């Protein structure tokens, strides 16, 4: 099962991460979710929380921070992705600081809509999960814009 249709090389990079690498956590207050964020979107990452799409921006950085998560299996952090509203706040906690994003858009796309992973000049985060529930027919996508990045204070 693939999330999108990509070349074999791209799929291998995305799905065959050598080991689980935690890079922080994500908190979505409006749906009551806090879950770990891992590098890559392999099964090891998505079974334990959110996965950062390969070669996309790190949270708080310029570009598109693309996040995948399950709706109905494992930790299912995006079970209520369709309840996230425009204006809701999403927090990323990383070793370098806290990124605060505001939701600006939601949409439903086909599985081949790889454009949602493209990089931008803007500071955005794109979350996606299979849609409808218990189906892989479409993807539910939520886009958010960075409001503020607060670096961690050095000790």
Question: Where are the regions a protein language model picked out?
Answer:
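Sec-dependent N-terminal signal peptides
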Residues: 1-2
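Solvent-exposed, non-transmembrane regions of membrane-associated and secreted proteins
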Residues: 6-155
């Amino acid at each position: 099962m693939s999330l999108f249709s990509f070349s074999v090389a791209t799929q291998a990079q995305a799905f065959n991460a050598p080991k689980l690498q935690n890079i922080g956590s994500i908190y979505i207050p409006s749906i009551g979710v806090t879950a770990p964020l891992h590098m890559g979107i392999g099964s090891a990452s998505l079974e334990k929380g959110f996965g950062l799409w390969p070669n996309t921006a790190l949270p708080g950085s310029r570009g598109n921070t693309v996040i995948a998560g399950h709706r109905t299996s494992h930790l299912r952090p995006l079970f209520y992705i369709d309840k996230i509203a425009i204006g809701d706040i999403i927090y990323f906690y990383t070793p370098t600081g806290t990124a605060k994003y505001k939701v600006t858009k939601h949409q439903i796309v086909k599985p081949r809509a790889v454009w949602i992973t493209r990089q931008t000049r803007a500071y955005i985060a794109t979350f996606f999960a299979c849609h409808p529930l218990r189906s892989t027919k479409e993807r539910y996508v939520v886009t958010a814009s960075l409001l503020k990045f607060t670096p961690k204070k050095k000790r």
